[in-house]
Amino acid sequence: MSYKCSRCKRDVELEEYGGVRCPFCGHRVLLKERAPEIKEVPVE
């Protein structure tokens, strides 16, 4: 799962039991990245 640190804006990959902390700056607030693809929904 890909996250972005809210302080240093770097991409962070978290492991399943690694804890929630940025390995670069130590900040504990991580933002979940959205999927880059756009979904199309048919409208009737």
Swiss-Prot record:
What reaction does this catalyse? RNA(n) + a ribonucleoside 5'-triphosphate = RNA(n+1) + diphosphate
Which enzyme type, at the first EC level?
transferase
- Give the keywords, sorted: Cytoplasm, DNA-directed RNA polymerase, Metal-binding, Nucleotidyltransferase, Transcription, Transferase, Zinc
Q: Which GO terms describe its biological process?
A: DNA-templated transcription
GO CC annotations?
Answer: cytoplasm; DNA-directed RNA polymerase complex
Q: Which residues bind Zn(2+)?
A: C8, C22, C25
Query: Which SUPFAM superfamilies does the annotation name?
Result: RNA polymerase subunits
Q: Does the keyword Transferase apply?
A: yes
Molecular function terms from GO: DNA binding; DNA-directed RNA polymerase activity; zinc ion binding
- Major localization listed first in the record, in broad terms: cytoplasm
**Cofactor(s) essential for the protein:** Zn(2+)
Q: What is its EC number?
A: 2.7.7.6
Keyword Transferase included in the entry's annotation: yes
SMART domains assigned = RPOLCX (SM00659)
Q: Where in the cell is it found?
A: Cytoplasm
Family classification: Belongs to the archaeal Rpo12/eukaryotic RPC10 RNA polymerase subunit family.
What's this protein's function?
DNA-dependent RNA polymerase (RNAP) catalyzes the transcription of DNA into RNA using the four ribonucleoside triphosphates as substrates.
Specify the protein name: DNA-directed RNA polymerase subunit Rpo12
> Which taxonomic lineage is given here?
Archaea, Methanobacteriati, Methanobacteriota, Stenosarchaea group, Halobacteria
